[in-house]
Amino acid sequence: MKKMTRVLGITIITAVGLVACGQTNTDHKNHESKEGKKTEQKEMKMNQEVTAPKEMNQGASNDLLTTSLKNVTRLNTNDPLQMAVLTSQTIWPATHKENQPGAVILVPVNEWQLGIASADLIHHPNNGPILFIEKEKVPEMTLKEIKRLNPLGTKDGTQIMVMGDIGAAALEQLKDYKVKQIKETDPAIFAKDVDKEYADITGSYPNSVIIGSSEEEGRLYTTPAVNWISHMPEPLLYTEKNKVPEATIEALKMRKDKANIYVLGPEKIISKEVEKELSKYGKVTRISGETPVENSIAFAKFKDEKTKFGWGFTKPGHGVSFVSNKTPDLAVAGAPFSHMGKHAPVILLEEGKASQPVYDFLATIQPKFKDDPTLGPYNHGFLLGSTSDISFETQGILDERLEIVQESGQGHGGH
């Protein structure tokens, strides 16, 4: 009897164990199925996030009263002179001493090489905007903005810094201010002179430099440098595709062979031979993308952790400027958006539209919240250009892609 009881007990235990095991297998399969669905849903959501919208509302741009949105502020002009003034008024209200500029930088409107390189002087301690001038005169719009700003002056009292060679009549218009001029017009020599001017003001040369192309085919690849050099002390020095100008070599030698040299652009713009030549004067790192759009994104994402050079935008919570590749002058005018406020690098838009690389980049920095969107972080965009250059539809897409979203994918209704 005891034997039978023992056998029966073992049988029951075994049966229960088998049932439990069967239940565990079923639960595991259900768990795997749920996890698989979650992964699939997440992948679908990610794919949705990084592609263009499928259904557009054709009437969205009709009867607009504003061209600025919750996440994207538009400076609505394609005139470089006006863009410079709009930027100046946005960054420097000049209502009191603490938000007046030190010195205003005046740049000939059609000389992009001078314009980009001179942005190094936007940074502290000068702390002032770029405004545009013509060779023989200072436009009325620019004069009025200088008067409104009432620049405080730098350490030596300079209120206006004139870039390039302008006529006597234009200088006469500035007679009420203390003016300093960098007269050089050759791009490489001019960039070297700006580098020296900044070193004279601050007392030392920064170890890091950006090397960009001064040639027309390289213009869009060099353009993103304008925001970094207005944000930080590092200058832009120029090169040609296959030859390093003597002026650039002289500037590099001031770093005593210890320069951190960041080449901006692919080998089709700045050759491997130039990179090799530059390596004689320090450590060379190339930052590049195949197209101007991809190049601007590569620069926005790059960070040298050792030297702290670079934006390093790979996580949420940033400001970003957007400019059409058809209007690069506007990037120079808007460079101060990286000097103060949101400290925004510039992303180029192919013919004013968001392309796949832009969608991919914005997906990596889109903010997400768990249960409280008021905690941030937040992104914000500055759109530099009129609606004829960058459409309201494109602006709406960028606004949505910069918006903070719930990490569960439920949207704002889930909190």
Give the predicted meaning of each segment.
Residues 1-9:
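Bacterial Sec-dependent N-terminal signal peptides
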Residues 23-415:
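Extracellular glycan-binding segments that recognize GlcNAc-based cell-wall polysaccharides
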Residues 17-20:
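C-terminal motif of bacterial Sec signal peptides marking the signal peptidase cleavage site
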